[in-house]
């Protein structure tokens, strides 16, 4: 099976708001089926990618950072006109999963993914207008997990002490 690998631009805090190369980075991710997130498991680079003393940076923060930026990106797409969208779905008695999948088709979200997410999160599948901001945020996170599964590649694992970070990351991010 052929695989296309693409190295995408760096990410900075606030990328989902368009800061740095954020929009370019997120647009590059739009077509990805899987992400391979290469982290410095030895914690020898800081948030800016600058070399620092090994084991002084928590590589789990790098994982959380990428997940957060992607979750906020998904949420911003869902939230565009959400109230009007939710009312329209209710008034037209449209199937919620079909409507949301259509809105997020550019992210490769399918109707089945939306249905599974709604069920998993125990959201009201009949009345979208009852969903809270937290419900919509949880949906964004779940859809991101389904459409952009992430493999963590532990770089610099040969540096003494990196094995402890590796074990901790495996516990914190089991999937």
Language model feature labels by segment:
Residues 36-37, 175:
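Short hydrophobic alpha-helical runs that function as membrane-insertion/retention elements
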Residues 37-40, 152-155:
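Conserved beta-strand segments of the P-loop GTPase G domain that flank and frequently precede/overlap
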Residues 77, 87, 129, 149-151, ...:
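Canonical P-loop GTPase G-domain recognition
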Residues 43-44, 73, 159-160:
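Short, acidic Gly/Pro/Ser/Thr-rich loop/turn segments
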Residues 57-129:
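Non-catalytic, alpha-helical, charged scaffold/linker segments
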Residues 2-36, 42-65, 130-142:
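Switch II of P-loop NTPase G domains
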Residues 114-150:
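Alpha-helix-centered segments that form part of catalytic cores
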């Amino acid at each position: 099976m052929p695989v296309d690998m693409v190295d995408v631009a760096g990410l900075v805090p606030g990328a989902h708001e368009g800061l740095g190369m954020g929009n370019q980075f997120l647009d590059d991710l739009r077509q990805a089926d899987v992400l391979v997130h290469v982290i410095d498991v030895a914690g020898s680079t800081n948030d800016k990618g600058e070399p620092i003393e090994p084991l002084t940076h928590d590589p789990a923060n790098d994982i959380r950072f990428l997940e957060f930026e992607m979750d906020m990106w998904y949420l911003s797409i869902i939230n565009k006109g959400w109230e009007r969208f939710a009312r329209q779905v209710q008034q037209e008695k449209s199937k919620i999963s079909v409507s949301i999948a259509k809105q997020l088709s550019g992210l490769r979200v399918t109707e089945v993914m939306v249905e599974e997410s709604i069920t998993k999160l125990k959201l009201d599948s009949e009345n979208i207008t009852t969903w809270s901001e937290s419900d919509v945020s949880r949906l964004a996170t779940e859809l991101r997990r389904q459409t952009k599964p992430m493999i963590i590649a532990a770089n610099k694992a040969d540096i003494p002490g990196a094995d402890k970070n590796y074990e901790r990351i495996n516990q914190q991010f089991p999937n």
